[in-house]
């Protein structure tokens, strides 16, 4: 009668990054991050891990808004961060009006919720971690990125 649900956990703004960074460090093939905003401060914290992943040959894909969609200093911060991401070998995709906040790791684990992974600063947020290759691949197809990332 009831289907077995994939394993999931909930995090807030205080607990998310510890779990996320642990999953990043265990990545073996690919990390996809969707974050509409990219801020200097958060990038400084995540960049060492992303750089380490890139050196290990792990594909990094970031889907975000184009910097021109941001106002004021946010556009400059996004543009500079995008250049830095590209310099470490990340693929950066742009989606107009983008507002999804999620990450997919090795197509086996994903996070989804309200926290902007590449720009979070000080708001009250929630993120759900789901460990399911079936659901991770389903999410990737649903958001339309499969055609850009291909098989792993």
Residue locations for each model-derived region?
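Acidic/glycine-enriched edge-of-secondary-structure segments
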Residues: 1-14, 32-38
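A conditional alpha-helix N-cap/helix-loop micro-motif detector
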Residues: 12-13, 43, 92
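Short acidic active-site motifs
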Residues: 19
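Primarily the HKD phosphodiesterase
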Residues: 23-86
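HKD (HxKxxxxD) catalytic microenvironment of the phospholipase D
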Residues: 31, 90-136
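Generic domain-boundary/flexible-linker signal
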Residues: 42, 71-73, 113, 121, ...
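A short, polar/proline- and glycine-enriched secondary-structure boundary/capping micro-motif
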Residues: 44, 73-74, 121-125, 148-152
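Cysteine/selenocysteine-centered motifs that mediate thiol-based redox chemistry or coordinate metal-sulfur cofactors
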Residues: 137-152
């Amino acid at each position: 009668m009831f289907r077995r649900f994939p394993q999931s956990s909930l995090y807030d703004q205080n607990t998310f990054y510890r779990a996320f960074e642990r999953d990043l460090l265990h990545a073996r093939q690919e990390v996809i991050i969707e974050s509409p905003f990219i801020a200097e401060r958060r990038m400084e914290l995540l960049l060492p891990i992303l750089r380490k992943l890139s050196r290990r040959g792990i594909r990094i894909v970031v889907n975000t808004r184009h910097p021109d969609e941001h106002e004021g200093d946010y556009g400059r911060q996004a543009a500079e961060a995008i250049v830095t991401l590209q310099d470490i070998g990340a693929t950066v995709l742009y989606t107009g009006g983008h507002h999804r906040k999620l990450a997919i790791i090795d197509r086996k684990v994903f996070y989804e919720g309200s926290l902007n992974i590449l720009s979070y600063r000080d708001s009250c947020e929630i993120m759900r971690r789901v460990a399911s290759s079936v659901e991770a691949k389903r999410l990737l197809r649903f958001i339309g990125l499969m055609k850009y990332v291909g098989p792993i």
